[in-house]
Amino acid sequence: MNKFFSFPILGLLLTCVRFVVAKERLFEWNVTDVYDVDPDGSGNSRWVIGVNNKWPIDPLVVDYGDQVIIKMTNSLANNRTTSLHSHGLFQKFTPYMDGVPQSTQCEIPPGATFYYNYTALQNGTYWVHSHDMSQYPDGLRTPFIINALEEPYDYDEEYIISMTDWYYTPFNILVPDEFKTWKNPTGAEPVPDTGLFNDTANATFAMEPGKTYRLRFINIGAFNNYDVMIEDHNMTIIEVDGEYTEPQEVSSIHLTVAQRYSVLVTAKNSTDRNYAITAYMDESLFDTIPDNYNPNVTAWLSYNSDASYDLGPDIDEIDSYDDAELNPLYSWDVTESNHSINIWFDFFTLGDGANYAEINDSSYVFPKVPSIMIANSTNVDGYNLEPVTYGPYTNAYIFEYGDVVDVIIDNHDTGKHPFHLHGHTFQVLERGEENAGLYSDQESHTYYDNPMRRDTVEIEPGSFIVIRFIADNPGAWVIHCHIEWHMESGLLATFIEAPEMIPSISSPDFVKEQCMLDGVPTIGNGAGNYKNISDLSGAPSPPGEMPAGWTSKAIGTMAACVISACIGMGSIIFYGASIHPVPTEELDENDDLQEAALENAAMFLDTDKAVEKVVEGKDEIK
């Protein structure tokens, strides 16, 4: 289909499709805390966030064209808000359903109910998760499958296989106490305690000889990448991130946080044994590796429940492949880009002593008004066409409808980062190898033919990536690193797409009423000012830069240290120089020890006189 097809006509056609094939699929979610959960059987029980007092949360499964309604009631304890993002869905014509607080909606306050209501206009493997306060690593996430009306590949059965890193301590404790604190100025991310398949240990998937299975792998974790292998089985990739690919046979797949793969696996004819599915954690992401740490997670293809579940031989090296070499099954006929932006990111310690991410020298902070409502309410005199209107730290970029945009992302950091763009899939035009340097450092650039499309892509350390998308989806779409620690650090930007068209798809009244319950304004600029849109005073901002040189506080601290050191040295000198003779009758076989002690005391003294005093003391003792 021509990507520049008329927006109104496309909307009419999609509406017609809904009348032909749509079913209403209502999911009633009461979001609750669930206690005493021990998914790996280690004895490390903790609370999690579940649905209807249950965890793990059942996957959502619908068909293409269905009307999806998630009635989400916030019953969390301790006055916590929440939200729900359908990861990978474009939300065409419903951008206010994307579930990102202060971007497309307001948080769902305690006791309130919000209806996520949209049409499933894609098919493939997705997931839903909270986009609020690091809640999804604490359990508020589950796979979301949209079945195609007609599948391009044949298979007999399918399994959904989620994988996640798991922490025994909840994130609402880890973030303030161990990560985003002056005690962690380098931003070292807490290492997961373990990993899980389908939120449990030793998950099994029954196999029947000769059948072909579609395995939908989804990394719903917070931090870690996984390399996945199936013992003595090859896999054929047919889908990544909701995009069908040309078939590619591989021995392993690499999933960053938020990525998805569908692979076909044909079962063996023999049932004399079972085979391990092993996910290997990418330990290069960890600043430190705990003693006796097990980086591997295991599930099983079960051919015979009476046979043993024995691990095969250890793997010395994983035969990896470059996912950028994958080709989409349905190619895009995309013209050259007419718009290009270059963003870079790195991490810095700011004025509060904690570590923050910055995109082009700016750490993301939520605006006072949700970005999509800023675009809607400042549509006068061209204010909604100016990035600064959305807040000085919203990292906003403006695109016109139909722009073909190249986004060059330079990674100044020493770690890998999975970047995700809401509202789109994108072409991966070029990706530099590890430590290749910046995009501008390269002597030449060669873009892939029929490049892979997906919504989450990994950027190598000290390197770059080039992605291309078409700005055909009016709305406010965040682009961010999907490592949860880095989202907490501010590694986000906002793409404001076709702002002049956003008022025509304005947020419904019930979305705005949700903001009123939250006490959040729905009109104005990023500072919440609507009478004078150019006035950004009071806009939220990150901590200031770490002061250079000696501040008064630092001087005072150093002075206190020097005074304490002088007092300590003075005490040593005073007591060392005031040694009194010991009566001879008290000397015994410990005399040598006493001499050694006196000699050690003399090491702390700087003057010859003091040393002589110690020697005299020794002579008097003798």
From Swiss-Prot:
Q: Which cofactor does it need?
A: Cu cation
Segments on the Extracellular face: 23-553
Under the heading PROSITE patterns, the entry gives: MULTICOPPER_OXIDASE1 (PS00079), MULTICOPPER_OXIDASE2 (PS00080)
The record places domain Plastocyanin-like at 49-147, 194-304, 386-498
Location in or out of the cell: Cell membrane
The record lists Cu cation 1 as bound by: 85, 420
Q: Which SUPFAM superfamilies match?
A: Cupredoxins (SSF49503)
Query: Would you list which residues are glycosylated?
Result: 30, 79, 117, 123, 198, 202, 234, 269, 296, 338, 360, 376, 532
Q: Which Gene3D superfamilies match?
A: Cupredoxins - blue copper proteins
What PANTHER family would the database entry show? IRON TRANSPORT MULTICOPPER OXIDASE FET3, MULTI-COPPER OXIDASE
Outline what the protein does: Could be an iron transport multicopper oxidase, which is required for Fe(2+) high affinity uptake. May be required to oxidize Fe(2+) and release it from the transporter. Essential component of copper-dependent iron transport.
Please identify the protein, giving its name as recorded: Iron transport multicopper oxidase fio1
Q: Could you tell me which species this protein originates from?
A: Schizosaccharomyces pombe (strain 972 / ATCC 24843) (Fission yeast)
